[in-house]
Amino acid sequence: MPQLDTIYILMTHLWAWLMLYLTTQKIKTFIMTSHPMIYHKPNKQTPTPTWL
């Protein structure tokens, strides 16, 4: 029955996009509520010539 196949494909498609959307929302809220990470800039030391 083609109608049932279309409904099944549509429901599977909508379910997959809903799960993807909810996962991204969960990740966003987790990042906002978690402790902020402290990023240190690497201490760039310029190489000194050997003759100095």
Curated annotation (Swiss-Prot):
Record GO biological process: ATP biosynthetic process; proton transmembrane transport
Main location: mitochondrion
One CC-aspect GO term: mitochondrial membrane
Superkingdom, taxonomy of origin: Eukaryota
Topology class, membrane: Single-pass membrane protein
Keyword annotations: ATP synthesis, CF(0), Hydrogen ion transport, Ion transport, Membrane, Mitochondrion, Transmembrane, Transmembrane helix, Transport
Bilayer-crossing regions: 10-30
Keyword Mitochondrion: yes
Cell location: Mitochondrion membrane
Quaternary structure and interacting proteins, as annotated: Component of the ATP synthase complex composed at least of ATP5F1A/subunit alpha, ATP5F1B/subunit beta, ATP5MC1/subunit c (homooctomer), MT-ATP6/subunit a, MT-ATP8/subunit 8, ATP5ME/subunit e, ATP5MF/subunit f, ATP5MG/subunit g, ATP5MK/subunit k, ATP5MJ/subunit j, ATP5F1C/subunit gamma, ATP5F1D/subunit delta, ATP5F1E/subunit epsilon, ATP5PF/subunit F6, ATP5PB/subunit b, ATP5PD/subunit d, ATP5PO/subunit OSCP.
Protein's job: Subunit 8, of the mitochondrial membrane ATP synthase complex (F(1)F(0) ATP synthase or Complex V) that produces ATP from ADP in the presence of a proton gradient across the membrane which is generated by electron transport complexes of the respiratory chain. ATP synthase complex consist of a soluble F(1) head domain - the catalytic core - and a membrane F(1) domain - the membrane proton channel. These two domains are linked by a central stalk rotating inside the F(1) region and a stationary peripheral stalk.
Membership in a protein family: Belongs to the ATPase protein 8 family.
Name under which the protein is recorded: ATP synthase F(0) complex subunit 8
Organism in which the protein naturally occurs: Lycodon semicarinatus
